[in-house]
């Protein structure tokens, strides 16, 4: 009996080995025939996932940079059922974003976006096609044009004054700058999206911040292994996310209905106005009949969520990283404060029109976006057809990931890339509008972030005021080099821990 059992066990094991060998052989043969970019070896089912063991997976852009050093600037990874090509050099960025921009204009829809049921209308993930062209045109010409962003100056001035007053109330004591900046940015975005004085605005802001944080915490496993979609269900994260959205949707329904009722009043003339918020603009365009594809209430909600997800954390994160780097680099802080205080000398109140000639402060912002890029991995693209890049063939429906963090720290492109040196942007004119592929914090090509003008405007004024009105100290006698600069990866890559500083009011000599 034991002999029969042993024979059966040995036979079963041999059959298993033969089957496994065939699977691995077929896998390798298929990969070889595709002429894919180089990458780590792949196992059946899990692909290249095992190569991530031992790497810094909490900050995946670190792990991908380490792998790229071994396999090159164009690298193929098989993560479960996800076929992924990672670009990690400015040259590969240009090859993909410029030479193959149309072929990779599709965006893969992540699991978390599908959970929220707005993936087909969200600005970031809307499928390439007629509706994408329409919402893209609306975004660039109406919602986030230079003129429209400038017209919202009064919101930024008002909210930044409130931020400065709040900080002044904590003078000479340790205060949470992260909270002050986050409150400023989220309120500016809310007022730009649906106006001021709306019912439950503060509650919606709170829910939106919870939504962004919860979305960043949802596992990416269902994207790699669709069969594991039950994990966020069992963990309760899917239900938690949907409950937040359901509660926030009730507020948005009220806001949108309130705007619709306003358009029905006899005083409404249907004309464009500098005081229009995003909901006003969308309803005006719909009412004029200028749109080829009608905009529905779910569409308006999706746009608002896009604005909050893309505009709130990104701007506040950039401002806080800038202040963090300035605290770590006292000489840079001294230089930028000298510029701001010299140009604005004697002004008791700073207006947005006053900060147009601050080249060094703008260089500080650019250097922050380089060294502490809020989105170190740009939102992925997806090939709509096979493409050839650098002699390799990338099949249709392959996801393309851009490791911008690796590019902005490439020693071949940047001298002393780990150091905070704003002067590099004074000496060499490099912009972030998508044509300098060594510096693409907002992406490039057809899928470049349409709200970058809005995002930058939400950084410049508050940063100028923080530098003008206060001198800053680290708490508890901390030395600059001891300031915690640990990052946390999520929807954006911000500080892991809040930034606590001591503000001291600057003695302004007011001009007569």
UniProtKB/Swiss-Prot annotation:
Transmembrane segments: 1-21
High-level lineage: Eukaryota, Viridiplantae, Streptophyta, Embryophyta, Tracheophyta
One family name in Pfam for this protein: p450
Tissues and organs where the protein is expressed, per its UniProt entry: Mainly expressed in petioles and roots, and, to a lower extent, in leaves.
Membrane topology, as annotated: Single-pass membrane protein
Catalytic activity: tirucalla-7,24-dien-3beta-ol + 2 reduced [NADPH--hemoprotein reductase] + 2 O2 = dihydroniloticin + 2 oxidized [NADPH--hemoprotein reductase] + 2 H2O + 2 H(+)
Annotated binding of heme, by residue: 436
UniProt KW keywords: Heme, Iron, Membrane, Metal-binding, Monooxygenase, Oxidoreductase, Transmembrane, Transmembrane helix
Pathway info: Secondary metabolite biosynthesis; terpenoid biosynthesis
Chief location category: membrane
A GO term from the CC aspect: membrane
InterPro entries on file: Cyt_P450, Cyt_P450_CS, Cyt_P450_E_grp-I, Cyt_P450_sf
Locations listed in the record: Membrane
Alphabetical list of CDD domains matching this protein: CYP71-like
PROSITE patterns, sorted: CYTOCHROME_P450
UniProt keyword annotation of Oxidoreductase present: yes
Alphabetized SUPFAM superfamilies for the sequence: Cytochrome P450
Organism of derivation: Melia azedarach
Enzyme class name: oxidoreductase
Cofactor: heme
Molecular function via GO: heme binding; iron ion binding; monooxygenase activity; oxidoreductase activity, acting on paired donors, with incorporation or reduction of molecular oxygen
Functional note: Monooxygenase involved in the biosynthesis of limonoids triterpene natural products such as azadirachtin, an antifeedant widely used as bioinsecticide, and possessing many medicinal applications including anti-tumoral, anti-malarial, anti-rheumatic, antibacterial, anti-inflammatory, anti-pyretic and diuretic effects. Catalyzes the conversion of tirucalladienol to dihydroniloticin.
EC number: 1.14.14.-
Name of protein: Dihydroniloticin synthase CYP71CD2
Similarity field: Belongs to the cytochrome P450 family.
